[in-house]
């Protein structure tokens, strides 16, 4: 399962 992970 791929989820959006912000790299901020």
Curated annotation (Swiss-Prot):
The modification Pyrrolidone carboxylic acid is found at residue 1. The modification Tryptophan amide is found at residue 8. The keyword Magnesium does not apply. It comes from the Eukaryota. Keywords: Amidation, Hormone, Neuropeptide, Pyrrolidone carboxylic acid, Secreted. It is found in: Secreted. The keyword Secreted applies. InterPro entries: Adipokinetic_hormone_CS (IPR002047). GO terms for molecular function: hormone activity. GO terms for biological process: neuropeptide signaling pathway. GO terms for cellular component: extracellular region. Hypertrehalosaemic factors are neuropeptides that elevate the level of trehalose in the hemolymph (trehalose is the major carbohydrate in the hemolymph of insects). Belongs to the AKH/HRTH/RPCH family. This is Hypertrehalosaemic factor 2. It comes from Periplaneta americana (American cockroach). The lineage of its organism: Eukaryota, Metazoa, Ecdysozoa, Arthropoda, Hexapoda.
